[in-house]
């Protein structure tokens, strides 16, 4: 039966939500009521599938963890007052921590003046952020287009590459197996997981995939495309595959891809949505081997875990195709004052506190610990790998990975799997994680593995 719209019901919902937003704490009954409401509304109005996913990593098989607020820079608190060390980091958005005071203050100050821009007058923070990124990014990257997410930044990069290369008769894109670039139609065409792709086939034509890290396969594909007249417009890569399971390419792979792109007059698009902003021990992962892309995609941590923002940064030669008609690709909210304020403050914090170097130091500590635990539990752990504070623990099968996440949850450590590799749990905490918290994470990992060994043996 079709239901009639109800203004009264909508008004009551908004009043209830606004009341919750104002609250700092909940009593026991309010907590129970909120949990019931959230579960019901997810089931009836968001997507019931998310509830089953949440159950798979919640101790006891229930929905007890309804997120309420950030705790410290590096922790989350649920409606029951339980505090969790965040080793998931919102899939890489909290590089400067939760509610970083510098970022929050910048956004609050901008909010008091002007939340959104007029669309007609020139907005100063967009200009200042573009200038900052031109100074911060490697090579000849100079111009920035701002959006609201990583998927959008990739979509803009693909369109920009098309606009630049189409007059040259180049229409083919090469991506890699295991890649994740987003789920909008263009980005999904570059993404490599069939689960995400199949329901939306056919995707955009002209996308090819080669094994990640295999430079010979890349050369062969570029050569064959040239032979058949399907000349390559661009190669799109993650310097380290995040959702693929934190897969690091062989040393020298990225410079070799850059050289091939130059040889075949193809653009190099680097998707640093997850690896950028200090995550791997450098401001951008491509800097580990001094690789300079033609187009760089950023998002996630760029907004400091406070505001959503994406950026597509390109060289002047490539970006100039949009000079004559800047309206070829635009977005209403991209580059808005609040998001730009957050991004500028985030970059300031990353540089002032030298967080990329901290990520390298603490990441080495964590990875060394996980590798040692892997040697102690070879029946459970297949591999541990990573760079900086982008780390993966790969288990011998999917079920061990799910059980490990649940055990860590029980010890108040938040972790989760990767989208393209379900055997792999990622460790992607804020770069502000303390040494003491790193030690807690390693201790909890040891306890979780010991408990899993017992449960596997009993089974």
Curated annotation (Swiss-Prot):
GO-annotated molecular function: diamine transaminase activity; identical protein binding; putrescine--2-oxoglutarate transaminase activity; pyridoxal phosphate binding
Coiled coil: none
Family: Belongs to the class-III pyridoxal-phosphate-dependent aminotransferase family. Putrescine aminotransferase subfamily.
Species this chain originates from: Enterobacter sp. (strain 638)
One Gene Ontology biological process: L-lysine catabolic process
Gene3D superfamilies: Aspartate Aminotransferase, domain 1 (3.90.1150.10), Type I PLP-dependent aspartate aminotransferase-like (Major domain) (3.40.640.10)
Cofactor annotation: pyridoxal 5'-phosphate
SUPFAM superfamilies (UniProt xref): PLP-dependent transferases
EC number of this enzyme: 2.6.1.82, 2.6.1.29
Reactions it catalyzes: an alkane-alpha,omega-diamine + 2-oxoglutarate = an omega-aminoaldehyde + L-glutamate; putrescine + 2-oxoglutarate = 1-pyrroline + L-glutamate + H2O; cadaverine + 2-oxoglutarate = 5-aminopentanal + L-glutamate
Binding site for pyridoxal 5'-phosphate: 150-151, 274, 332
Broad class of enzyme this protein falls into: transferase
Pathway: Amine and polyamine degradation; putrescine degradation; 4-aminobutanal from putrescine (transaminase route): step 1/1
Domain of life: Bacteria
Protein name (database record): Putrescine aminotransferase
A Pfam family the protein falls into: Aminotran_3
Residue positions where N6-(pyridoxal phosphate)lysine is found in the record: 300
InterPro entries xref list: Aminotrans_3, Aminotrans_3_PPA_site, Class-III_PLP-dep_AT, Putrescine_aminotransferase, PyrdxlP-dep_Trfase, PyrdxlP-dep_Trfase_major, PyrdxlP-dep_Trfase_small
Key words of the record: Aminotransferase, Pyridoxal phosphate, Transferase
Function: Catalyzes the aminotransferase reaction from putrescine to 2-oxoglutarate, leading to glutamate and 4-aminobutanal, which spontaneously cyclizes to form 1-pyrroline. This is the first step in one of two pathways for putrescine degradation, where putrescine is converted into 4-aminobutanoate (gamma-aminobutyrate or GABA) via 4-aminobutanal. Also functions as a cadaverine transaminase in a a L-lysine degradation pathway to succinate that proceeds via cadaverine, glutarate and L-2-hydroxyglutarate.
Gene: patA
């Amino acid at each position: 039966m079709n239901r009639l719209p109800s203004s009264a019901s909508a008004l009551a919902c908004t009043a209830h939500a606004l009341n919750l937003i104002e609250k700092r704490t909940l009593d026991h009954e309010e907590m129970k009521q909120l949990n019931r409401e959230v579960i019901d509304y997810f089931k009836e109005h968001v997507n019931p599938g998310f509830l089953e996913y949440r159950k798979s990593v919640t101790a006891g098989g229930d929905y007890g963890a309804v997120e309420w607020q950030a705790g410290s820079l590096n922790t989350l608190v649920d409606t029951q007052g339980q505090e969790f060390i965040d080793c998931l980091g919102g899939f890489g958005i909290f590089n400067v921590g939760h509610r970083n005071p510098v970022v929050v203050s910048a956004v609050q100050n901008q909010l008091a003046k002007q939340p959104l821009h007029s669309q007609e007058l020139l907005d100063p923070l967009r200009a200042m952020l573009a200038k900052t990124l031109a100074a911060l990014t490697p090579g000849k990257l100079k111009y920035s287009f701002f959006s609201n997410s990583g998927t959008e930044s990739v979509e803009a990069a693909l369109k920009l590459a098309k606009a630049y290369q189409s007059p040259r008769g180049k229409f083919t894109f090469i991506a890699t197996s295991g890649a994740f670039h987003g789920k909008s139609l263009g980005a999904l065409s570059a993404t490599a997981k069939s689960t995400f792709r199949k329901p939306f086939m056919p995707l955009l034509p002209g996308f090819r995939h080669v094994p990640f890290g295999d430079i010979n396969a890349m050369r062969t594909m570029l050569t064959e495309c040239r032979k058949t007249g399907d000349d390559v417009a661009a190669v799109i890569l993650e310097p380290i595959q995040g959702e693929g399971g934190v897969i690091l390419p062989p040393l020298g792979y990225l410079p070799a891809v850059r050289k091939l792109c130059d040889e075949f007059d193809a653009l190099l698009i680097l998707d640093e949505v997850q690896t950028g902003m200090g995550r791997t021990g450098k401001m951008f992962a491509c800097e580990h081997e001094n690789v300079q892309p033609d187009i760089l995609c950023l998002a996630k941590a760029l907004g400091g875990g406070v505001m959503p923002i994406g950026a597509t940064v390109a060289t002047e030669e490539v970006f100039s195709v949009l000079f004559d008609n800047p309206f070829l690709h635009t977005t209403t909210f991209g580059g808005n004052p609040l998001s730009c304020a957050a991004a500028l403050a985030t970059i300031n914090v990353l540089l002032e506190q030298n967080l990329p170097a901290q990520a390298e130091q603490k990441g080495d500590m964590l990875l060394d610990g996980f590798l040692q635990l892997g040697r102690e539990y070879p029946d459970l752990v297949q591999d541990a790998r990573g760079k900086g504070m982008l780390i993966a623990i790969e288990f011998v099968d999917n079920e061990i990975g799910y059980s490990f996440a649940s055990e860590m949850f029980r010890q108040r450590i938040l972790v989760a799997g990767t989208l393209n590799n379900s055997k792999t749990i990622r460790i992607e905490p804020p770069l502000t994680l303390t040494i003491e918290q790193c030690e807690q994470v390693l201790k909890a990992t040891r306890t979780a593995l010991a408990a899993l060994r017992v449960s596997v043996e009993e089974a």
